[in-house]
Structures are given as structure tokens and as C-alpha cells.
């Protein structure tokens, strides 16, 4: 009996002991458990990946939507600014027109007042000159009658001028 034979017998006995103590089943159970755990981890990783892709797609959709909303807000703000500028320009033009019209009215009123004042002064001067001439040429009784008559005429003329 050789050493090889005894080594073979030792190996067979060792394997028989392993089978007797159910070591192969324990190893298989352990490997099955480990394989199941790895499979579960892979399934979880796939689920998480799909969830991450869904979240990414949702984020990208929301980002695109937010970008679109921002563009709409900017466009609306630009339209509003243009409307405000246009309205301000129109109001400024109206203000300038009104101020010019008011200035023209004031100038026309000042011209009319100046003409009335000059006319009134000319009338007063003419009446005074006529009074002086009449007083020199007429007696006092006749002069008073003519002055009264001319004053009445002058008053009527002034009233017509002021009323017109």
C-alpha cells in the first residue's frame, strides 16, 4: 500500500465526512442566499435606475416648462413696457398740445386785453380832447349837455366792446 493509496483513502474519508455533516448543502444554501441577495440588489438597482430616469425626465419636462413660462413672462413684460412707453408718449404729446393751446389762448387773451386797453385809452383820450375843445368853443350849459350825451355814447360803445 502506497502513499498514494492512503492519500486517496484520506480524501474519500474527508469527502464522506463533508457529506455526512451536510457541508455541501450548507455551501449551496449559502451560495443560493448570496445569489438571491445579489439578484435582489440588482433588481433594486434597476428599479432605482428607472426611478432616477423618471425623475430626470420629470425634471427636464419641468425645466422646459419653466423655460417656456419664463419666455412668456419676458414677452408679456416687453409688451407691457412697450404699451406703457407708447401710452406715456401719447400723454406727453397731448400734454404738449394742451400746453401750446393754453399758451396760444393766453396770448390771444393778452392781445385782446391789450387791444381793449388801447381802445379804451384812445376813447378816453378822444373824449377828454373833445371835452376840452367843446369847453373852449361852447358855453357851459351846452357843453354839459354834449358831454353827457357823449359819455352815454362812450359807455354804450365800451359795453358793446366788452360784451363782444
Curated annotation (Swiss-Prot):
InterPro entries: ATP_synth_b/b'su_bac/chlpt, ATP_synthase_B_chain. The chain crosses the membrane at residues 4-24. Keywords: ATP synthesis, Cell inner membrane, Cell membrane, CF(0), Hydrogen ion transport, Ion transport, Membrane, Transmembrane, Transmembrane helix, Transport. The keyword Cell inner membrane applies. Pfam families: ATP-synt_B. It is a single-pass membrane protein. One of its GO terms (molecular function) is proton-transporting ATP synthase activity, rotational mechanism. It is found in: Cell inner membrane. F(1)F(0) ATP synthase produces ATP from ADP in the presence of a proton or sodium gradient. F-type ATPases consist of two structural domains, F(1) containing the extramembraneous catalytic core and F(0) containing the membrane proton channel, linked together by a central stalk and a peripheral stalk. During catalysis, ATP synthesis in the catalytic domain of F(1) is coupled via a rotary mechanism of the central stalk subunits to proton translocation. Component of the F(0) channel, it forms part of the peripheral stalk, linking F(1) to F(0). Belongs to the ATPase B chain family. This is ATP synthase subunit b 2. It comes from Bartonella henselae (strain ATCC 49882 / DSM 28221 / CCUG 30454 / Houston 1).
